Amino acid sequence: MGRKRFITDSYPVVKKREGPPGHSKGELAPELGEDTQSLSQEETELELLRQFDLAWQYGPCTGITRLQRWSRAEQMGLKPPLEVYQVLKAHPEDPHFQCSLWHLYPL
């Protein structure tokens, strides 16, 4: 039956370099700047509003604006976050801020 064959019998073994010259495994990557890691103020506010959209305890959010949902939750005594109200009042005409995640989907 012969000897057991290996893939290296047909293809030569090629050792790859481990990285660019002067780079060793023990070195850490350089620290990124503070502004590249932190989100902008607008992105932070939009993320807060997305989390508000996903919070089921304030009721459904389809078919109404975020401000209407916040007001309804406030009237029902559900204590929605005041930060959400402040963000919505700061951007009264911007649909990115006023409309929920699902405003583009038909009812």
Swiss-Prot record:
Motif (PCNA-interaction protein motif (PIP box)): 1-16
Stated role: As a component of the tetrameric DNA polymerase delta complex (Pol-delta4), plays a role in high fidelity genome replication and repair. Within this complex, increases the rate of DNA synthesis and decreases fidelity by regulating POLD1 polymerase and proofreading 3' to 5' exonuclease activity. Pol-delta4 participates in Okazaki fragment processing, through both the short flap pathway, as well as a nick translation system.
Principal cellular location given in the protein's record: nucleus
Organism: Mus musculus (Mouse)
Compartments it resides in: Nucleus
PANTHER family membership: DNA POLYMERASE DELTA SUBUNIT 4 (PTHR14303:SF0)
Induction comment from the UniProt entry of this chain: In response to DNA damage or genotoxic stress, such as UV irradiation or treatment with an alkylating agent, protein expression drastically drops.
Family recorded in the similarity comment: Belongs to the DNA polymerase delta subunit 4 family.
PTM annotation: Ubiquitinated; undergoes 'Lys-48'-linked polyubiquitination in response to UV irradiation or treatment with an alkylating agent, leading to proteasomal degradation. This modification is mediated, at least in part, by RNF8.
InterPro entries: DNA_pol_delta_4
Sorted UniProt keywords: DNA damage, DNA excision, DNA repair, DNA replication, Nucleus, Ubl conjugation
Biased composition (Basic and acidic residues): 15-28
Keyword Metal-binding on entry: no
UniProt region (Disordered), positions on chain: 1-40
Gene Ontology annotations for the cellular component aspect, listed alphabetically: delta DNA polymerase complex; nucleus
Keyword Heme belongs to the record: no
GO biological process, one term: DNA synthesis involved in DNA repair
Record note on quaternary structure: Component of the tetrameric DNA polymerase delta complex (Pol-delta4), which consists of POLD1/p125, POLD2/p50, POLD3/p66/p68 and POLD4/p12, with POLD1 bearing DNA polymerase and 3' to 5' proofreading exonuclease activities. Within this complex, directly interacts with POLD1 and POLD2. Directly interacts with PCNA, as do POLD1 and POLD3; this interaction stimulates Pol-delta4 polymerase activity.
Protein's recorded name: DNA polymerase delta subunit 4
